[in-house]
Amino acid sequence: MERRRGTVPLGWVFFVLCLSASSPCAVDLGSKSSNSTCRLNVTELASIHPGETWTLHGMCISICYYENVTEDEIIGVAFTWQHNESVVDLWLYQNDTVIRNFSDITTNILQDGLKMRTVPVTKLYTSRMVTNLTVGRYDCLRCENGTMKIIERLYVRLGSLYPRPPGSGLAKHPSVSADEELSATLARDIVLVSAITLFFFLLALRIPQRLCQRLRIRLPHRYQRLRTED
C-alpha cells in the first residue's frame, strides 16, 4: 500500500487523541445525519473482551451483520492494527452511503475495500487479502440511543504466524453469509428431493421390477450356458 502524504484531517487527529486519552471522549457523527447526533465513546473500544478468528492466507476480514437497520441509522467498522494500537481505520455508513471516513494517514486498510450488502440482512465486509497489514481487531459499530456501541468484536490473525488453540480448528470463512449458506443448503435439498421423486416415478412405472426380472431370467441362462460349454 502506498504511503499517503498531505494534510492531516482535523477529525482524524481528534479521534487519535481520543484513543490515547484515559477520560471518556466522544466524536460527533451527526453533521451529515438526518437523525439525532450519535456519539462514539472511544473508551468503549477497549471494553469488550476480544474473540479470536484464526485463518490461513486468503480472503478475510471483519464482517458485521445487522438486522432491522433503518434508513437513517448509522453503522460502521473500526479497525485496529495488531502491531500498533495507534493505527486505526474507521468507516461509518448511513443509508448505504459512507458518511465519515477517519482514514489512517499511512495505511488505509479499508479504503476501496469495504463493501455493503443489504439482502437479506445488512452486511459490512471487505475482500482484502489477509496480510501483515490487515491483521488486527475489527469492531462492528452501531448507533444505539445516541451512542456508537460495539456489537461484535473480531480478531483476524495469520494462521501461519500464530499457533492455533488446541482443538479450535479453522473458523468458518467470514465471506460466507447466511443467505449464501442458505442457498447452498437449498440447492442440496432440491437435488435430494428430485432424486427421490425420480426414483418413485420409475417405481410407479415398474421399471425397477422389470429390470430385476430380466436380470433373474438372463443370469440362470448365462450360468447354464457356461456349464454347458465347460
Swiss-Prot record:
Glycans are attached at residues 35, 41, 68, 84, 95, 101, 132, 145. The keyword Iron does not apply. It is found in: Host membrane. It is a single-pass membrane protein. Residues 206-230 are cytoplasmic. One of its GO terms (cellular component) is membrane. Keywords: Glycoprotein, Host membrane, Membrane, Signal, Transmembrane, Transmembrane helix. This is Protein UL16. It comes from Human cytomegalovirus (strain Merlin).
